[in-house]
A protein has these predicted regions:
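Conserved ABC ATPase "signature" region
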Residues: 120, 130-148, 257-258
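Conserved ABC ATPase signature
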Residues: 153-157, 161
Length: 270
């Protein structure tokens, strides 16, 4: 396997079986994900786009080990992705930034406790109050927040500040792959631009890879290195970003392009 590949997905499927009625003898099958294969390279922003229900969220859950796959394989840096293997400690290496900064933080805990907790659990720092506060303050500084934020509760922060806290919490265990699940859809435009700039800077600084899950092609155009288009649980097309926007190969990709109200084909400063 190419050493430049951080994540490899091969023939990944997730099927759900159900009965339509109480009198059905045979179960029906919903193919939420059906034979998906792709690779994510080191230090790459790999965008996964598609309409609601195309399988984007199911894909992220499978990568994170939050649901069992029906078939297929997932490899992280050439090794089978097995979250039960404590020696490999994959949970520390793969993190997710959730869509909603309002519900992803515990309203009853101070910020420093939430940021430092993963580091304590993974043996990065000791479970001492001073160590936890100092560690959280350092992480907050890395995402553009003041040290005093460490003693705040989530309700005391704006949406943009909460999302920055979410980023700091993800980075506290020094991940190599970060899944961004619609990271700015709950934020206004100006704050979204700040968060996206921050994520880009952190990628360049830390050498991480991103799987950027979104339905917004404008953001994909400005941020992603490659684009993966999904529909009905399958991959329709994978292409370099510029190639995708200049000449989409699949009819569904062209439909997505046409559905955009407007798009700038230059890369403005966000």
């Amino acid at each position: 396997m190419d050493e430049n590949v951080i994540l490899s997905v091969s023939g990944l499927s997730k099927h759900y079986k159900y009965y339509k009625t109480l009198f059905d003898i045979k179960k029906n099958v919903i193919k939420a994900l059906d034979g998906v294969s792709f690779e994510v390279f080191k230090n790459e922003i790999f965008a996964v786009v598609g309409e609601t229900g195309c399988g984007k969220s199911t894909l992220s859950k499978l990568i994170l080990g939050l649901t069992e796959k029906t078939s297929g394989e997932i490899y992280f840096k050439g090794e089978p992705l097995d979250y039960g293997n404590k020696k490999k400690d994959f949970r520390k290496k793969i993190q997710i930034l959730f869509q909603d900064p309002y519900s992803s933080l515990n309203p009853k805990k101070k910020i420093y406790k939430m940021i430092s907790y993963p580091a304590v659990k993974n043996g990065i720092i000791k479970n001492k109050k001073k160590d936890r506060i100092d560690f959280a303050a350092e992480q907050l500084e890395n995402v553009g927040l003041s040290e005093s934020t460490a003693f705040s509760y989530p309700h005391m922060l704006s949406g943009g500040q909460r999302q920055r806290v979410g980023i700091a919490r993800c980075l506290s265990v020094r991940p190599e792959l970060l899944i961004l699940d619609e990271p700015v859809s709950a934020l206004d435009v100006s704050i979204s631009a700040q968060i996206l700039n921050l994520l880009t800077d952190l990628r360049n600084k830390n050498g991480m890879s991103y799987i950027f899950i979104t339905h917004d092609l404008k953001l994909v155009r400005h941020l992603a290195d490659r684009v993966c288009v999904m529909y009905g649980g399958k991959i329709m097309e994978i292409a370099e970003t510029d190639d995708f926007f200049n000449a989409p190969a699949h009819p569904y990709s062209k439909t997505l392009m046409e559905s955009m109200e407007s798009i700038s084909f230059t890369r403005p400063n966000l």
